[in-house]
Amino acid sequence: MTKLLHGNEKSSLNGGREPLFSQKELLVLAVPLLVEQLLEVTVGMADTMMVSRCGEAAISGVSLVDMINNLIIVLFAALATGGAVVVSQYLGAKDRPDADKSAGQLLLLSGLSGVVIGAVCFVLARPMIRLFYGSIEPDVLDAGVKYLQIIALSYPFLALYNGGAALFRSIGNSKISMQISFLMNIINIVGNAVCIFGFKMGVDGVAWPSVGSRVVAAALILRKCYREDAVLTVPKTLRLDGGMAKRILGIGIPSAFENSLFEAGRILVVSMISTFGTVQIAANAVANNLDGMGVIPGKAISLAMITVVGRCIGAGDHEQTVYYTRKLLLWAYITMGLSNGAILLFLRQLVGIYALSGETMELAITLVTIHAGCAIIFWPLSFVLPNALRAANDVKFTMVVSILSMACWRLGFSYLLCVRMGWGAVGVWVAMVIDWTCRVTCFVLRFRSGAWKTKYQA
């Protein structure tokens, strides 16, 4: 599939050119990201399995809120992406003072956004769930409101952690965020087990350990950022710098708009599924958990893509930009082929881990089969390649493509197949594959055209 990107560009570096990244440096960057993503998805699966012991109303309420939670998380991630791109570009241009300044601005913006969004979600939890999902069963609604109000308290700390982790990725040291993520997830999963099985707390037992783990993670990452021997010197006194903030937000806002609308679209299609009852909601939640395993390598490599391409763009080296984009995409195809192949091979055993009824289990198996089979082919070009364009400041194009593809293909066909034709969750997942096909076409053509080369200005 990576041959689609070739166009008129060379597929390797000139012999005399000094590469910006060695094979070892790429692995040092990518492997910890892979482990971090694995931890995140594994803990998410553990949360779902544990709360499933509290009944299908509880798992449905938590899964519906997790869609809103993902919407919030992508806002923080988009802001972190904007900061990571700017820092990487300054490092590529060997402009250390501005790299330090942009690092401080990222942390400041992350903290402010976390406080504002957390307060809004806490106060408006019930109206938000009603807005997104309309009329749902009362016990599902009550579980969702309780979960969202508690988890909203963690948003400021999650935003700070994401910002700090992005800074370490931008300098090629993803090991730090991996270590802190490991501790955060251990706290979370142990806390869940104690609260759910020991204290019989229900959805509270999933939410409170998440809050505690994120507080610890934020404290640790900030301590690392302000160490005297840190590669980046983050200013101890943070004041808003209009010019630098504008540069970060110039990448972060389009990415946030794109990703938040993408997640909002996912929430809308889940709201279509929710009209078919608890069986479809629960099967969709379990399928999302398992499919998260399949895309772990792709997500890790897409994060590495931001650092690598951002550094190449800052150095003004388009040849290396193309070379490393293709290299990382090849890695994504190989690793995602292995991960999704393993899921398909052991699918029934994996779904059997969850406490599901027979009907729910069979539907979950069907949904995972659709996703895993198609992700091997379409996912890397749909979601890894766009990060190369973002790192080159071509954020408006990726935003427009993602929004239009979501609106026209995923939402449109979800309504047609799920609601009008009565396919339920299966119709939504078929529409997802149609959306991926559109994204692949647009992003490949854009990369081949070379239009992204004109977007970065030092």
Give the location of each predicted region.
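Short alpha-helical transmembrane segments in multi-pass integral membrane proteins
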Residues: 1-30, 87-154, 196-253, 309-375, ...
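N-terminal transmembrane alpha-helices
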Residues: 17-49, 53-54, 70-82, 86, ...
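Interfacial/gating helices of multi-pass transporter permease domains
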Residues: 28, 51-70, 138-143, 203-204, ...
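Transmembrane helical elements of multi-pass membrane transporters/channels
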Residues: 28-47, 150, 184, 213-217, ...
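Residue-level hotspots within the lipid-embedded alpha helices of multi-pass solute transporters
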Residues: 37-38, 74, 114, 118, ...
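Helix-terminus/linker motif at the lipid-water interface of multi-pass membrane proteins
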Residues: 38-60, 129-138, 194-201, 260-293, ...
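Small-residue-rich hydrophobic transmembrane alpha-helices
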Residues: 59-119, 158-177, 270, 281-347, ...
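Short runs within selected transmembrane alpha-helices of multi-pass transporters and secretion channels
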Residues: 80, 150-169, 177-188, 206-221, ...
